Every structure is written in structure tokens, then in C-alpha cells.
Amino acid sequence: MNRTGRALAMGCLLLLQPLLAQAGGNSLLIPAMGRCTLNTQPENLEEALAACVQAAKGGDAEAEYELGEFYYDVNNPKRDLNQALSYFEQASLQGHAMAQFKLGTMFYKGEGVPANNIQAYIVLKMAAVNGAEDALDTADEVAEQM
């Protein structure tokens, strides 16, 4: 390993040190910081939902996105497009590409809000710039209808 490689490896280890301390020194238990998981068993759903809401209140864009997905899901008995829209907007403001893609799609289809092709196009272009792969195609589709 050359000098640059050693310096990079040392830098990575120094960055991981606080996470290793939280895991009690067990490198296999490094916590996923600020994440929430809603794909749990039904009996654990309320607890998982509460954890996600707490993370979202703390500004975790991924938690906001996950909550948006949860409330957007057509198979969810708790489906709420207004809640989904709100969480997607919060994550979108932090540059979360998939939240921007979902938000743009909701504006385009008029889900939870009146359809607005101009707003959809702008948000979808932002999503494409931030890395959402399908956003550019959807933005082109919106542009054809403007």
C-alpha cells in the first residue's frame, strides 16, 4: 500500500472511531445513524413508525422519505396523501433525490394536490440533477404536456 492509500485508510478509521465507540467496540454492530425501517412485522409497526417520526423531527431526510413512502403506499390502510406530500417536501428541501422524484410525480398526477405541470417539471429536474434516474424521463413526459 502506498503512502496515499495508508493516509486514506487512517482517515477512514478515524472517522469510524465514534461509531465504533457507540457499538461497544464491536465493529459488526456499527449503528445505521438516523435511519428508520418501516418494513417490519405488523406487531412492530407502531414502534418503528414512532422511531421514524422521531428521526424525521430531528431532520433526517431519509426518515422523512421513508415516512412519505409509508403514507403514499396504496396497500397501506393508513394511506394519507397529504402526509406523504408533507414528508416528501421536507426531505426534498434537503436535496433527497427520490423524495424530489416522488414529489414531482405527485404534482404531475395531482395526488394530494391539484395537478401542476410547471411545478412538477421543476421538481423533477431537481431530482434528476440530484441523481434520481427516472426523473429525467418523467420530466420529459411532463414537458410534452405543457
Kindly label every feature range from the protein language model:
Residues 30-39, 66-73, 102-109, 140-145:
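Hydrophobic face of amphipathic alpha-helices that form TPR/SEL1-like repeat modules
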Residues 41-50, 78-87, 114-123:
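Structural signature of tandem alpha-helical TPR/SEL1-like repeats
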Residues 1-9:
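Bacterial N-terminal signal peptides that target proteins for export
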Residues 9-18:
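Bacterial N-terminal signal peptides
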Residues 39, 57-60, 73-75, 93-96, ...:
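Short helix-capping/linker turns of helical repeat alpha-solenoids
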Residues 53-55, 90-91, 127:
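Canonical positions in the second alpha-helix
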Residues 20-51:
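N-terminal leader/linker segments that initiate helical-solenoid repeat arrays
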